Structures are given as C-alpha cells and as structure tokens.
C-alpha cells in the first residue's frame, strides 16, 4: 500500500468533481462498525489450515467449558492502515497483529476471536479464526494479522483478542485488549479518505470579504460538489473589543450540479454604527454526512486604520486667539456651574414631586413593552428506570403534575401499555423518538439508582440488572431499549438540546447520572424545575435586559397545586422507604444472590395475603360407599305443602365394624291436603348389635318381623284422605290411623298384643326361631314403581345413596339364614317394642289400601296371634 498523495493546490476540475460527487453518494450515512470487502478473509499459513467466519461474540466454550484451555495472546499491536474497496473508495482500517506464546498450550488452541468495541456507541463486531488443523512447533513464533475492520475518524475503539476455547469462569483470562484512537480529518492521510472527503475535508471555500459603500459587505466563496444548502453567519465587533454589536444570518439554497465549484457572491447589509467596524464571517455547510455538525470556515475583516498625519501647527499664533480661547473656556465653565445650580434647585423645589411623578411615568413606559412570550402546547417523553413501585409512583405523580399544572402532554409507557403490546417495544420506542424529533419536543431522562446500574451493565462493567418492576410489567425493561435507541444521538452535539437530564434530589444524587450525559446540563428536581420548564418551552430564562420567571413553578411554589402536593407525598414515601431499607435496590434486583431472603415491598405495602398463614387451597373428593350388612338407614317421610314431584333424600351412615347393635326402625307418616310427597331418608343412630338395611320387598317375598339376624325394612305407608278414593290409583298420602273404623283399630291392637306375647315367650325360652307370620304384599307393582321413581331421581339428587339390587338383598338374606340358628335373641327394650308397634301399624295401614288382600291378611295374622 503506497503512501497517500497530498491534495492538489489548484481547484479540482470538472472530472474530479464528478468523481467526488459519486464518492459522496456512495459514502455511508452513519458511522458503524463493518468489515471491508476489498479481498477475501484469509488466515491460513504454512502448516495451518484456517478459515475466518463472522461471530456473535459468544463462543460455545462459555456454555460448555473445557478442562484444558490455551494461554493468552502476546505482543498485541494495533496500527492505522488504509485500504481500497472494490469500488475504489479509500477507508481507514485497524491493522491487528499478535503472536502466540511458545508453550504447550498451542496444542489445545482451536482458534481466536477478534472483538472491536466502539466506545462512544457501545457497538461491537466480532470475527472468529477457526483452526481446521492442530498447531505444531515449527521453530518460530506463530503470528497472525487481520486488517478488515473499518474505523471512523475521531473515534476510539477497544480491540480484544481471545484464544479459543475460552477459560472456565474461575480460570485465568486468555485474552488481551488495547484501546485504539483514530485521528480526525485534519490528519494528512485521513483527509483524503472517503469518510472525510464526504464531510468536506478537501473543501477550500476561499472566502473573500469586501467592504462596500452604504454599510454593506460582499462575501464570496467557492461551492462544494454536493447539493446542500449553506449558511453565512456575520458577527460584528467594536474596535479592540470582544463583545458583539451586530449579528446577522443569511441562508443560501442548495446549488444545482452545474454550479458546483463555482463562486457564490452574497451582499450583506450592516447596521449604521460607526464603532462596529470589525467583522467575522463564517460559512457553515450542511453536508449529508455531518448535517449541522460540519466544519465551519471563517474570515475576519479588521477595522480600517486611520492615517496618522497630523496637521502642521503654525509657528506664530495671534494674541486675540488666546483671548478668544480663554473666553470660551470661561463661558463653558460658567454654563456648567449654572446648570448644576438650576438642577439642584429644581429637584429641591415644589416641582420636584411633579418631576418625580413624571420620572416614574417615564420609567414605567418601557415596562409596557415587556410582553411575556406566548407559551406553546408541548409534549415530552419521559425515560426512566422502574427501580421500585414507590419510585414508579413518583414518576406517575410527576407526569400528572406536568399534565395538570404545566399543560404539557406526556408520553409514558405506563399510560400506553396497550399501544406497546400491539406495536412492540422497539417499534413504540422508535415511534416516540421520531415524534419528539419531528415536533421539536423534549425527551426527559429521569436518572436514578437503576439508570446507573443498567448503564454499567450495558457497558459490560457491572453485573446484569433485572428489577422486580420490570419483571412484573408486560413490556419489560423499556429503559434499556430507549437507551439503545438514543445512543447514536450523543455522537452529534447538535442533538444534545433534545434531551433534558433530571433527577429527584430527594431520592437520587448527581452520581446516578450515567457518564453518557456528562456533556448535558443536569437539573435536580424539584429545585430547578422552573429551568426545566423553560427548556421544554424552548425559551431562554435569561435574555439581554430581561429575565423570564414562572412564579407557580419557582422554589416550593409547586406545592400550591394538588398535583404538586401529591408529588411531594410520593417523594416522601419513597425517601422513608430508603431510610428503612438501605439495601432496597439489592432486594429489588432479581439477579441478586440473597434475593430469596429479601423482603419485598409488593408483599408488605401493596398486597395482602389471600389466605391465612399456614393454610392453602385444598381439593376434597367425596367418597362413595355402598351400604353393607353393617349399615343402618332410617326413613323419615315428610309431606310437602306444595305440588310437585316426590323428592327423596337418602343419607347413609355406615356403622363401624366390630360394634353391631340392634336398632329398631321407625317410620313417621304425615298427611297432606294436596300435593306431592317429599321424603327424607336419614340414618338413625346405632347403639350396639346387628345393623339393619333398607330393602324393597318384591311379590311373594317373606319379610320377618322380629329377630336380630334378619334384615330390617322401612316402609312408607300411603293413606288416602278420602275413604272413597281407590288406594291403587291414588298417590296422595293417607290420613292418620285414628280415622280408621273402630273394629279395625281393635283388630290391630289384638294383633300387636299377640306379637308382644310371642316375643316374651321367646325370651323366656332362651331363644326363638324366626316368626311364622309372613305378610304377602299384593301391592308389589306399586312399590316397584315407587322404587323406580326413587332410583330415577338419584341422578338429580346428589346426596341420595344408591339402592342395592333385589337379587343382592335376597342373597344376603339367605346368607343370614345359614348362620347359627341356635344363637339366642337379645331381650327387647320398651323403645324397641314401641318401634315394633309402629312398624306393625304401618304394615297394617298398607294392607288396608288393598281391598283384595284383606281377608288373606286377617287369616294369616290370627294364626301367629294364637
């Protein structure tokens, strides 16, 4: 690569102008890291097969660490070289060169990773050398070079070379880093590069300034080969002074291509001031590569020098001239003394009051001209870090104060979560920034503890930060996304005016402001909020001869508004929380090591426990059990007052095994006027003895009335209210047994007496066999219909117990008959006898419903009574 040629002294010709125009069009619009494509990327050497690949700066050896890793590079050197692209453009590149250490670690060297970090934008680009063969000792040092990283003028980079595989987290580092500063476009070699040429490094405007008559200046300069507008800045100064006495600005539209490299003449009119004679003229271009930050060229016009040729004084002066000069001097002195005496008398006389009033009126006239500038509706975008729920509340109250007290529209992520969810985080952030730039609005950056930590993590100098509030929000951490979006603006000083850097002095400090905003002014809130408001309005607080003030926003006057008082209350709450919990930020960081034991304000202040301590939500499943031989059921039929279908409620109570006891069955029969029967079947308490169960008798089934081994039966007796109603076709409950005829009641009492005597005789003999009386139920179909009705309702009555099938009942009865017949029966208590009597009465009432079976029942009942 040859040395750079010096630029020609003469003005470039038309052919060179067209070439420079083409280079300006092809030049990139913004500075960014990239690789040069002038030749293929080659890293192979004799004895080594190697390829160069683009890398993501994250090698897989960090995920899968190796036991044996190579040592670090040696003699890392970085130099500035220049290279041409395929289109012939000249770009500055970073020439990186390093060597390997002569130890056995080269046997485990699999490659190298080159990383270039641009410090002002935090942009990184990586390239990986992948060795396809193992390195061997060849009696000299292995040396590698790479010259494809394109750098920009006046930028600083950090170059790092990693040997692969990378070491384990606790191992010694095997990389080497160096900083590299690229010179600006004033450098002789950098001046002829494509990036510098596109920003006008070779442009020589050759400014000439001529002073014309009638207080005018003629400015002439040479245009550059880019169609862009120019601006002429004229500043005039008094002789031998530095403060300006006149300023003027003149815009020149973009020239046509045929006017490139031609002279442009502009005539400027000066103010008629005799002492304002020294002028400074500046030409500011607006090239596409640098916009309003391009280099300015200036020229100065000095004050004209007066000739020092004094007039010759005559040697002889007449005497009368002396007397004339003396007289004039006396008159002047006398006039001055007289004027002083008159002024003193007038001020002390009666007319002084009037003069004073006139003076006040005269002094008050200029005050009428001091009209405050009109305020415009503005919009701001607030960028902040959600450090804590209380700090988020402070930001919300600050936004509310801007809306209500200042009339300023606010763009805040907390107020536009739906729009962020629909458009996406980066799309919404880019849209807000574009809107702020187009409307010439301001972006307020609220700095806090989290902004400093996130900025350090963004630079790679601190631990990663993940706050609870960011984790809880649907959109996540918007501060990091916003910082990535606004970072390129801080390469251009002209963009600094868009950003207003603030921090709440009550809960934050000046050290929480990231280094990125070091060149921007910092405003502690709410002490200097008045200045922030003037920044939002694009007004200067201090101007020549006047000072703008907003009394409602100065000092502590913001507390007069409701929004200001709410903001102060939010600041006090957060400050008190910081005093109570000094390590609050570490507790809010989810990446902190002791996060498990840290208390959270979400649980203490904003949330209440849903369940008492030590309890939880328990899911219980019902356990369905079939009534067995040890089960007991008691039936209590009740009569409803309203019409409707019959509803049966069955609740089985299982008797614990090993505690059998005889339990009499009881049945309650109640009558209703009109309506359906509502029957509730509930288990009765058991004492000890054999259990009983519920079964429905079929036609021809023998049902024993006494004896503990037998199965007990509950029967529901339906008695018709009207004796004329047919018992077979009526489903209405029957009346009380007191309504029966006298002979029927006497027959029933005799039957019960005979049964009682039989039971007593069985006790006297030490045991009794099964009763001989068998009741035949001719109304089995009707009972079967009742049973089917009860079973059909079980699907709708959740608490009904399933009924055992008839076959199972008969099998159980046969098994009970096979038991020991010689087992003596236990004595009956008076309560058992009363229950038995009630049962027999129910059976009799059922038989009375059936006219056809009365004679048979009577003959069979007389037998056992005898």
Swiss-Prot record:
Q: Which residues cross the membrane?
A: 321-341
Q: What is the lineage of its organism?
A: Eukaryota, Metazoa, Chordata, Craniata, Vertebrata
**Name the UniProt record assigns to this protein:** Interleukin-17 receptor A
- Write down which residues bear the modification named Phosphoserine: 708, 736
Acidic residues bias located where? 809-819
Its biological purpose? Receptor for IL17A and IL17F, major effector cytokines of innate and adaptive immune system involved in antimicrobial host defense and maintenance of tissue integrity. Receptor for IL17A. Receptor for IL17F. Binds to IL17A with higher affinity than to IL17F. Binds IL17A and IL17F homodimers as part of a heterodimeric complex with IL17RC. Also binds heterodimers formed by IL17A and IL17F as part of a heterodimeric complex with IL17RC. (Microbial infection) Receptor for SARS coronavirus-2/SARS-CoV-2 virus protein ORF8, leading to IL17 pathway activation and an increased secretion of pro-inflammatory factors through activating NF-kappa-B signaling pathway.
Short name of one Pfam family = IL17R_fnIII_D1
Q: In which tissues is it expressed?
A: Widely expressed.
Q: How is it modified after translation?
A: Glycosylated.
